[in-house]
Amino acid sequence: MSECDKELVDMVWGRNNSNGLADSVFKRWTQGFVFSASEPTALEQFEGGPCAVLAPVQAFLLKRQLFNTEHSNWRSCQDEEQKEILCHTLSDILEIVSFNSNSYCLASWLKEKATRETEQENPAESSQQNEQPTALAAEELGFERFHASIQKRKFNSLSELKEAVLETYSTWRNKYGVLLFLYSVILTKGIENVKNEIEDAERPLIDPVYGHGSQSLINLLLTGHAVSNVWDGDRECSGMKLQGIHSHADVGFLTILESLRFCKVGSFLKSPKFPIWVIGSETHLTVFFTKEMALVAPEAPSEQARRVFETYDPEDNGFIPDAVLEDVMKALDLVSDTDYVNLMKTKLDPEGLGIILLGPFLLEFFPEQSSKVPESFTVYHYNGLRQSNHNEKVAYIEGTAVMGFEDPRLQTDDTPVKCCLQTKWPFVELLWSADRPPSLI
């Protein structure tokens, strides 16, 4: 399979990819990074599946456009600017997964294969093709032929990588750009490193039946770690170590599944460094974002206390055994000598039930602090699927978020997007400028 390691293909598609993989699943993933004609900084998604790559890339692209540039109008972007911001974004993600190892890889076409998806002999013709509004017009390659046509290129410095990413802009734009970037991420991270982080190495990163990306794939792109869970830190279950997230990511993650109580996202993903969150529904990924940096202010002592407390409450019961109270207090640098801990046990568990509730614990050691979050601010939602947008034109939906309305009479709606956001802000209300609320599917 050329230089494209079979291990890589098995990791992405499963070991039985040559026999059991549906052609439709592979075809749904064969698209490039294409900007919307209606929203110059928004990427389009043609079919279900590749949102596992497109949504994280869109989130990092917005981070760069909103906070790393001096654009007076972040929604305006000319052709050359699109090239720069996309390539810089792809390089940013590759830098994250490399962890400053100064070793980077790109999956690219074999130099001797002058296919229609790659550089054309006629530059004018190539330029014209790359500006097409869809990346689906390139030649159809089957699963085997595609993987026989790519190679691995290595780079020993970030500057070399960035230059190569810019030079291959047409590759990212053309039909197999998303897959080539996904392979570049895995090769840069290292196949063995990915295997060591995935909970079940036998489970492929892309579901061979439905084509959805796994949580490990999403986490890899968002944090640089291919762990399978979204909670903070590691947990132990029946002697097995289950890896989670270990630091605040640049871009966050929220999921509708938490509102349905199927999982609980930890504060490292809920409270990223920038106010941008990939939003997960049962089948799709979208992006929610704002320019309000007060939403991601440094972690308050009470937030840190909640996070530490919850690491000792792996089943999310809202309480811990009183036997681990001393460990929690030590982790938070609170006074933890034996007599004081016993006094706190008596105060926090007056009925002698042997448990410490989260609420009384926070009130005792971290009384209510004034919030720095503004009462209202402008928010945006992105959904890359054409059919999920008005008139099938991919564009951001603008709205206003209002915080702090605990009176149920003031609730505006119970849409999926609000239910998802309430896992982070329980009393948020949303007023959208469009006639209908954003779709998460």
UniProtKB/Swiss-Prot annotation:
InterPro entries: EF-hand-dom_pair, MINDY-3/4_CD, MINY3/4. It holds the Pfam family MINDY-3_4_CD. Keywords: Apoptosis, Hydrolase, Nucleus, Protease, Thiol protease, Ubl conjugation pathway. It is an enzyme of class 3 (hydrolase). One of its GO terms (biological process) is proteolysis. The keyword Cell membrane does not apply. Its EC number is 3.4.19.12. The active site is at residues 51, 284. One of its GO terms (molecular function) is cysteine-type deubiquitinase activity. It is found in: Nucleus. Belongs to the MINDY deubiquitinase family. FAM188 subfamily. This is Ubiquitin carboxyl-terminal hydrolase MINDY-3. The gene is mindy3.
